[in-house]
């Protein structure tokens, strides 16, 4: 109450921001007449002028007025579109670390040209981020003429591009891409073996379209690059047969309650838990199958993996539904994005869940994968120096944007007032009654030729409603994950008179629904249309447009409330764009997911009793409050989940940044010999200290153990015991120094034989490969630690603090192991003299000639062979692992390069 009074007196923060920006709009508008007088060449020359001024010390903010005036005038000439004042305000908001909330139809795509041009002047690259490939291509092609007129290069970066094309895309001034492709390219860059293989430049400025979808809805989705793990297909198939024998119970066992079921479900978190009774039953079945020994339990360390498979199968059967969470297409399980309703081809659930669902659906089970590299969107986008976003609905999540990303949200006023009629929700007792009322509502709209967009929460619900409409004889289009390819065509027709379109949870978002239908889409179907054909299409559209306007514009029907008010607002926002008329209404039932999960049985029973007859609709302010309360609970729950994930991921993120920084240093540096020397001293000191403790007496020394480890781990044959017998006063420090110096001398003699260049390449290759391998194993270990860390809470310990402590210990151990492995490999390699190499090459040449009649080498293989033969010296396979990097610097494993079969001489 007090905050409302203060706001009424002083205005809100948003009001003050807008007031300040409107003053700057006045300055930009004053420049308009001056810029209109410029010739095309003079206008285009502004870009070079701005870049020169930046080089001389000017700031982007000092150029803003002129830069925006330049873009506005160029847009008017090239695209026939002039930026509104509110779009200039939006552009200023997006220039820095802010989020602009702009209603649907207010021209976000055109607004984006302003901050993109301004930030591209820095020459560091601008990334415009969209939710799918279609929007990335569409927006790039829409704005390309404008940017190219102003001398800026534009490119699109999507999945499947050739490496060179992708590299060129990132070198463009403005790159349009999807959030997932940007994240995956970042991970790929940090798996590259040479700096030339990398794609991305410095992460400078990102402008995220539909920012709420990417930074909020998908925040908990980690981007993962995986490699194959061991095959467990038969185990998934076997365990899949167990689940039908298990019985559900309503709540978990406790001191006061013991159920008769085998498992309980946590619908909020999509988790399943076996009861004690269920555990015994599953153990019995697994023993009968021969997967466990008699008397073993699933909590035995050797059987934990089986328990993991059981839980994955239980979740697959009881918590994940076909046509809701995934579809089966061409013999594959394809995930449905819960936030957009679109399919996510190529994405797979982790932790064995995807394989469990494949077993459930009796399709081919693809192998499990081991994480090689991963990052969340939260941490990826926080890597940018400047981050901004735009969406139609951000204000409800303003607190989270500020807390997690440090981004302020500014609500941009509409160019024209919104006159959409948002009607009160209607509540029905059952889903069947609700669907009947929806059909009646659609028929009423069609009677006056009003187009209707019906929003559903899942593919399953959209198909149920579609079947009901078909039975009622109502012609309609369905836009869901199964009809993704026809999305643009369906959306183009959604605003036509009497059109009925069913859309899953905002599928089609990002494309405006034009009242009367999209005449440009009709025009695009014609090859070289004549003026007469163009006029005929426009005239027909105008007639349809007038009809729809008189009918009340686009009517939105929501078939149930979503977990977030923001998603509901997005659905409503499809109607009433740019001052057009429109209306919306949500139809609810007590069977809806939101009601079942977040309202207790007592409230539901009370509400059921309020209905006196079948088909009766309830609408009241109390109902609205109950729904708002349920949504607030969900939003709070989801925010805590995302915040919790970030707190854990921040621990891994610090380690990730350290590893990737080290990796980039290795790629950029040609000579790491100084680093290797430092590591060698550390490793040998550590090893020697294990067997000869510092400041200890000789009786405590384990000389035999030291000789053995130096031989096996470092290939050094040292008569340390003999030294001690001959030199009675040989001090510990002197002995330590002698061993380290001998190790250096051995290494230097190898380098003299093989040459400094080859040795530098080998050092770098060994370091990179070992770093990648150990980091991959570390990620798996961190995953396991994360999954079980919550159990520390039962021991009255803070799981987050325990996770930080243990993960740091694991990270430190990994780095120590890295140093040890690298020095071990470098110490054990053996080299041969030039004479031995020439003899080996002569034998090899003779062998190659003998085989030439049966083998035709490709040009590439011949060139590679020629390059290998030209090396000044050869490393043998005597003391080097076949999986170690080849010293020639090719980036290949030894067994695939100089260690290949032809090279074993």
From Swiss-Prot:
Quote the record's binding site residues for Zn(2+): 886, 888, 897-898
This protein's UniProt keywords: ATP-binding, Cell inner membrane, Cell membrane, Cytoplasm, Membrane, Metal-binding, Nucleotide-binding, Protein transport, Translocase, Translocation, Transport, Zinc
Q: Which GO terms describe its biological process?
A: intracellular protein transmembrane transport; protein import; protein targeting; protein transport by the Sec complex
**Known Pfam families for this protein?**
P-loop_SecA (PF21090), SEC-C (PF02810), SecA_DEAD (PF07517), SecA_PP_bind (PF01043), SecA_SW (PF07516)
Q: One GO MF term, please?
A: ATP binding
Q: What is its EC number?
A: 7.4.2.8
Q: Which reaction does it catalyse?
A: ATP + H2O + cellular proteinSide 1 = ADP + phosphate + cellular proteinSide 2
Look up keyword Membrane and say if it applies: yes
Where is it predominantly found?
membrane
Q: Where is this region: Disordered?
A: 565-584
Question: What does UniProt give as GO cellular component?
Answer: cell envelope Sec protein transport complex; cytosol; plasma membrane
The Swiss-Prot or TrEMBL record lists the needed cofactor(s) as:
Zn(2+)
Q: How does it sit in the membrane?
A: Peripheral membrane protein
Kindly state what the record says about how the cofactor is bound: May bind 1 zinc ion per subunit.
Q: Which PROSITE patterns does the record associate with it?
A: SECA (PS01312), SECA_MOTOR_DEAD (PS51196)
Q: How does it assemble?
A: Monomer and homodimer. Part of the essential Sec protein translocation apparatus which comprises SecA, SecYEG and auxiliary proteins SecDF-YajC and YidC.
Role summary: Part of the Sec protein translocase complex. Interacts with the SecYEG preprotein conducting channel. Has a central role in coupling the hydrolysis of ATP to the transfer of proteins into and across the cell membrane, serving both as a receptor for the preprotein-SecB complex and as an ATP-driven molecular motor driving the stepwise translocation of polypeptide chains across the membrane.
List the PANTHER family hit by this protein, alphabetically. Answer: CHLOROPLAST PROTEIN-TRANSPORTING ATPASE (PTHR30612:SF0), SECA INNER MEMBRANE COMPONENT OF SEC PROTEIN SECRETION SYSTEM (PTHR30612)
Q: What is this protein called?
A: Protein translocase subunit SecA
């Amino acid at each position: 109450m007090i905050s409302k009074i203060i706001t009424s007196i002083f205005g809100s923060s948003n009001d003050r921001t807008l007031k300040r920006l409107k003053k700057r709009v006045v300055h930009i508008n004053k420049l308009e007449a001056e810029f209109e007088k410029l010739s095309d060449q003079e206008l285009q020359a502004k870009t070079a002028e701005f870049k020169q001024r930046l080089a001389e010390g000017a700031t982007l903010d000092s150029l803003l007025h002129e830069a925006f005036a330049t873009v506005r005038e160029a847009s008017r000439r090239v695209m026939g579109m002039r930026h509104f004042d509110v779009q200039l305000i939006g552009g200023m908001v997006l220039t820095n670390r802010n989020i602009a909330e702009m209603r649907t139809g207010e021209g976000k795509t055109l607004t984006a040209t302003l901050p993109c041009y301004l930030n591209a002047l820095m020459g560091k690259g601008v990334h415009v981020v969209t939710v799918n490939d279609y929007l990335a291509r569409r927006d790039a092609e829409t704005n390309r003429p404008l940017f190219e007129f102003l001398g800026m290069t534009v490119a699109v970066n999507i999945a499947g591009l050739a490496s060179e094309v992708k590299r060129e895309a990132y070198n463009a001034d403005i790159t349009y891409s999807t959030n997932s492709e940007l994240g995956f390219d970042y991970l790929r860059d940090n798996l590259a073996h040479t700096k030339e293989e990398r794609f991305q430049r410095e992460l400078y400025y990102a402008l995220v379209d539909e920012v709420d979808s990417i930074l909020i809805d998908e925040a908990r989705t980690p981007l993962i690059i995986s490699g194959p793990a061991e095959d467990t297909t038969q185990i998934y198939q076997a365990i899949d047969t167990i689940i039908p024998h298990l019985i559900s119970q309503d709540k978990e066992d406790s001191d006061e309650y013991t159920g008769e079921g085998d498992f309980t479900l946590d619908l909020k978190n999509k988790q399943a838990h076996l009861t004690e009774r269920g555990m015994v039953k599953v153990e019995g079945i697994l023993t009968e199958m021969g997967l466990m020994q008699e008397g073993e339990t699933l909590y035995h360390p050797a059987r934990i993996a089986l328990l993991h498979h059981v839980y994955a199968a239980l979740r697959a059967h009881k918590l994940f539904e076909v046509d809701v969470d995934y579809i089966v297409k061409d013999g594959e399980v394809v995930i449905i994005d819960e936030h957009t309703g679109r399919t996510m081809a190529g994405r797979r659930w982790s932790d064995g869940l995807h394989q469990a669902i494949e077993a459930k659906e009796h399709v081919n089970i693809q192998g499990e994968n081991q994480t090689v590299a991963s990052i969340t969107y939260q941490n990826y986008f926080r890597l940018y120096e400047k981050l901004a976003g735009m969406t139609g609905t951000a204000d409800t999540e303003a607190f989270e944007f500020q807390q997690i990303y440090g981004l302020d949200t500014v609500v941009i006023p509409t160019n024209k007032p919104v006159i959409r009629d948002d009607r009160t929700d209607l509540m029905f007792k059952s889903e069947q009654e609700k669907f009947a009322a929806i059909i009646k509502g659609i028929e009423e709209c069609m009677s006056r030729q009003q187009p209707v967009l019906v929003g559903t929460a899942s593919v399953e619900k959209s198909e149920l409603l579609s079947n009901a409409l078909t039975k009622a004889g109502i012609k309609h289009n369905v836009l869901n994950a199964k009809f993704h390819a026809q999305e643009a065509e369906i959306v183009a027709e959604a605003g036509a008179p009497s059109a009925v379109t069913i859309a899953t949870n905002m599928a089609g978002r990002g494309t405006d629904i034009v009242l009367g239908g999209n005449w440009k889409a009709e025009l695009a179907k014609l090859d070289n249309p004549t003026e007469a054909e163009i006029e005929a299409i426009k005239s027909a559209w105008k007639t349809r447009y007038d009809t729809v306007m008189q009918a009340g514009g686009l009517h939105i029907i929501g078939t149930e409330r979503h977990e977030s008010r923001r998603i509901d607002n997005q659905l409503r926002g499809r109607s009433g764009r740019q001052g057009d008329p429109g209306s919306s209404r949500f139809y609810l039932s007590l069977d809806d997911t939101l009601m079942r999960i977040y309202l207790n049985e007592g409230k539901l029973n009370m509400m059921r009793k309020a209905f006196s007859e079948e088909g009766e609709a309830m609408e009241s302010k109390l109902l609205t409050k109950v729904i708002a309360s349920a949504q607030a609970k969900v939003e709070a729950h989801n925010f805590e989940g995302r915040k919790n994930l970030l707190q854990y991921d921040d621990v891994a993120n610090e380690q990730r940044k350290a590893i990737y920084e080290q990796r980039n240093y290795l790629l950029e540096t040609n000579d790491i010999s100084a680093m290797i020397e430092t590591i060698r001293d550390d490793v040998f000191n550590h090893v020697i200290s294990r067997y000869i403790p510092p400041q200890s007496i000789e009786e405590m020394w384990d000389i035999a153990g030291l000789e053995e480890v130096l031989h096996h781990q470092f290939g050094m044959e040292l008569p340390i015991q003999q030294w001690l017998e001959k030199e009675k006063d040989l001090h510990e420090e002197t002995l330590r120094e002698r061993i380290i110096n001998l190790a250096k001398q051995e290494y230097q003699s190898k380098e003299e034989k093989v040459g400094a260049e080859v040795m530098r390449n080998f050092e770098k290759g060994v370091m990179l490969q070992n770093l990648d391998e150990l980091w991959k194993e570390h990620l798996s270990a961190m995953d396991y630690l994360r999954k079980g860390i919550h159990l520390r809470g039962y021991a009255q310990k803070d799981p987050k603090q325990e996770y930080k402590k243990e993960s740091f210990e694991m990270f430190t151990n990994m780095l120590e192991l890295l140093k040890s492995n690298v020095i071990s490999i470098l110490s054990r390699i053996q080299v041969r003299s030039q004479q031995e190499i020439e003899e080996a090459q002569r034998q090899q040449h003779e062998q190659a000639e003998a085989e030439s009649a049966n083998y035709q080498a490709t040009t590439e293989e011949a060139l590679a062979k020629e390059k290998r033969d030209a090396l000044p010296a050869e490393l043998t396979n005597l003391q080097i692992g076949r999986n170690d990097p080849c010293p020639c610097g090719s980036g290949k494993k030894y067994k695939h390069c100089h260690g290949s079969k032809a090279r074993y001489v």
